[in-house]
Regions:
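Generic structural signal for hydrophobic
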Residues: 42, 67, 121-122
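Ser/Thr/Pro/Gly-rich low-complexity, intrinsically disordered segments
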Residues: 3-5
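Hydrophobic faces of well-ordered beta-strands that scaffold small-molecule active sites
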Residues: 48-53, 74-77, 106-111
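Glycine-rich, proline-tolerant flexible connector loops at the mouths of alpha/beta enzymes
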Residues: 51, 72-89
Length: 122
């Protein structure tokens, strides 16, 4: 139980959060998935995965919202200039927070990384 009084129950690809004050409401939480996992499923299923560059939180939210409307997995891409403006940690936290609320798989991808060090940090 966390400080909000919620109980977490883990499943294979998601967590179910049950509010102790209202057991009838459940919220599914989808964590970030790896691009490898996402692309292997797409290859096996015979479908493509959209990958979109997002420069800020509003773009991340809009991309995930569109993916949810289409019931499709989505790859959020960032660039070296975007993570230089903020930080890798900040950008990853934004995407992870939005992915946690999503009903579809979301992964994060560093597009056109400029160095090995940045790729390892990402």
């Amino acid at each position: 139980m966390n400080s909000n009084g919620n109980v977490s129950v883990s499943g294979p690809n998601e967590k179910i959060i049950q509010n102790k004050h209202n057991d009838s409401k459940e919220e599914k939480i989808m964590p970030l998935v790896t691009s490898k996992e996402m692309l292997l499923k797409a290859q096996k299923g015979g479908y493509a995965v959209g990958a979109f560059n997002a420069e800020n939180m509003e773009m991340v939210k809009a991309i995930i919202q569109a993916a949810e409307e289409l019931k499709a997995p989505v790859m959020i891409q960032t660039t070296p200039s975007t993570v230089k403006y903020g930080t890798v940690e900040t950008y990853a936290a934004i995407v992870a927070a939005e992915a946690a609320k999503a009903s579809v798989p979301v992964c994060l991808h560093l597009d056109h990384g400029s160095s090995f060090e940045l790729a390892m940090q990402a």
